[in-house]
């Protein structure tokens, strides 16, 4: 079942941890592409210097962060890599969770084509399919078109994984500093990156 609106409400750090083990789904040309979320980062504007919304900064790009929880915030880095975030916290509190890595599940052939333009790939390439925010967006076909989209729809959503199938029993959740935020002064050290320790698709050990 799809995660209901209430799933995205509450403390952003708790929502981040709840997202681990759930499935990110995107339907592209009628074909389901998905992956189990294995790594996330929480961003808690306006006080978090690593957040795009630090200081209440409100731009065309960040406007969706000030909206209702349970919407997609997609942006570009280096002018070419998309990053997918889930908006959390009440309206007016610009916070969200970056999805950093997935374990691919559905639409593997389409994911391989999206990443490598071929379906015959090496084991190393397979592990590289979705082990980073830009990689997973390319794999699942997530672009700026999805910015601001409600996750209460059939095309793009979070699918809750039944307890008996959830991988949380196999991996320990570990917290640590977020990645590539050297500009963020004291926020560099906040342990707001959560991931399954030892999972092969985690972007950075």
From Swiss-Prot:
Coiled coil: none
One Pfam family here: Pur_DNA_glyco
Membrane-spanning residues: none
Keywords from the UniProt entry: DNA damage, DNA repair, Hydrolase
Enzyme class: hydrolase
CDD domains: AAG
Record GO terms (molecular function): alkylbase DNA N-glycosylase activity; DNA binding
Keyword Transferase annotated: no
Example GO BP: base-excision repair
EC number(s) recorded for this UniProt protein: 3.2.2.-
UniProt keyword Hydrolase, yes or no: yes
Domain of life (superkingdom): Bacteria
Similarity remark: Belongs to the DNA glycosylase MPG family.
Name listed for the protein in its UniProt record: Putative 3-methyladenine DNA glycosylase
Species of provenance: Bacillus cereus (strain B4264)
The organism's taxonomic lineage, starting at the top: Bacteria, Bacillati, Bacillota, Bacilli, Bacillales
């Amino acid at each position: 079942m799809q995660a209901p609106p209430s799933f995205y409400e509450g403390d952003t750090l708790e929502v981040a941890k709840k997202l681990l083990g759930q499935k990110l789904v995107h339907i592209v040309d009628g074909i389901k592409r998905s992956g189990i979320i294995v790594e996330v980062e929480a961003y808690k504007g306006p006080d978090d210097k690593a957040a795009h919304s630090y200081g209440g900064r409100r731009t065309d790009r960040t406007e969706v962060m000030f909206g209702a929880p349970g919407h997609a915030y997609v942006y570009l880095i280096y002018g070419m890599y998309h990053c997918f975030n889930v908006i959390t916290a009440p309206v007016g509190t610009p916070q969200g969770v970056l999805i950093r890595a997935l374990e691919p599940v559905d639409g593997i052939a389409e994911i391989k084509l999206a990443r490598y333009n071929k379906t015959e790939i090496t084991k190393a390439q397979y592990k590289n399919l979705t082990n980073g925010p830009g990689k997973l967006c390319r794999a699942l076909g997530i672009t700026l078109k999805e910015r601001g989209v409600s996750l209460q729809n059939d095309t793009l959503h979070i699918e809750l994984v039944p307890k008996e199938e959830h991988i949380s029993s196999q991996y320990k959740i570990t917290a640590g500093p977020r990645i590539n935020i050297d500009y963020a002064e004291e926020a560099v050290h906040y342990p707001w990156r959560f991931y399954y320790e030892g999972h092969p698709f985690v972007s950075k050990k």
